[in-house]
Design a protein with these regions (language model features):
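Exported/periplasmic ABC-transporter solute-binding proteins
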Residues: 19-273
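Sec-dependent N-terminal signal peptides
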Residues: 4-13
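N-terminal export/targeting leaders of redox proteins
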Residues: 15-17
Length: 273
């Protein structure tokens, strides 16, 4: 019996050592493809003695991993849903939320598309599949090719809520794994349209359309219709290196990195809003 106790102690020690040397972060592609890796690199350069294991596979995976104990931090481009919170609670996980930055969902079209502005109603109708040809919104005749995120993405559902009044995407929409894939498809297809986070605008062959005259930018975060906060989540109040990294992300240095990557720093968003 005593030997079993010692084995358990050793296993616990090994688990604690891993938590101190490797920080596992799972979830949102919007946050995990650019922002969080750059925050992680800056944290290490400033003396953070930790390695990072970051997987950006969609916001929903933040909560499945936290529930399973396979992540110390979850990244999400939306608030946790009720069923995700219930899953975590059932596993004994108490979610703590940290607002890390503001994002803006930008509508991308091909740079050769003459359409430069859309109304909110037109955006809804395009992504719901009601408007099927660019000539219906003043563009060159041609069938609209629609690109969205996949169902594990927080942006997938967030866009339905913010831009589509709860309606589903058109049947011909093509689901992409990440922002960069959407930008690539739109950039190579003159009839393409999709959405990306603010940090992914300016991709080759694409341009951003204004929404009722408003271009997504730090200055328009209050007025742009598809602005949203983004979050990090932990299981309970963070401790140790997890706490150190969270604090780094939320301090002025972290806020500066947020802005450089292309997101809206939370301090700037708070002042404007």
């Amino acid at each position: 019996m005593k030997s079993v106790f010692y084995i358990l102690v050793l296993l616990a020690a090994a688990s604690g050592l891993r938590a101190q040397t490797t920080l596992r972060i799972r979830g949102s592609d919007t946050l995990g493809a650019k922002l969080v890796p750059q925050l992680a690199e800056a944290f290490k350069k400033n003396g953070g003695k930790i390695s990072f294991d970051i997987a950006a596979e969609g916001s929903s995976t933040a909560f499945t991993n936290l529930a399973a104990g396979t992540a110390e931090i979850g990244m999400s481009s939306r608030k946790v849903k009720a069923d995700e919170r219930a899953l975590c609670r059932a596993k004994g996980v108490k979610l703590i939320e940290f607002e890390i930055a503001w994002d803006m969902i930008a509508i991308l079209v091909n740079k050769n598309n003459p359409v430069s502005d859309l109304t909110k109603k037109q955006v809804l109708q395009i992504f719901a599949g009601d408007i099927k040809d660019w000539s219906e919104v003043g563009g060159t005749p041609g069938p609209i090719s629609l690109y969205t995120r996949n169902t594990s993405s927080g942006t997938y559902k967030d866009f339905i809520d913010r831009a589509m009044k709860g309606r589903e995407y058109g049947k011909n929409s093509q689901k992409m794994a990440g922002n960069e894939q959407i930008a690539s498809e739109v950039g190579s297809n003159v009839n393409g349209v999709g959405y990306v986070g603010l940090a992914y605008v300016g991709s080759k062959g694409t341009k951003v359309v204004t929404i009722e005259g408003v271009m997504p930018s730090v200055a328009t975060v209050k007025d742009y219709p598809y602005s949203r906060p983004t979050y990090l989540y932990t299981n309970g109040e963070p401790v140790g290196t997890t706490k150190e990294f969270i604090n780094y992300c939320l301090n002025p240095v972290g806020d500066e990195i947020v802005g450089k990557v292309g997101f809206v720093p939370k301090t700037a968003a708070k002042q404007i809003r």
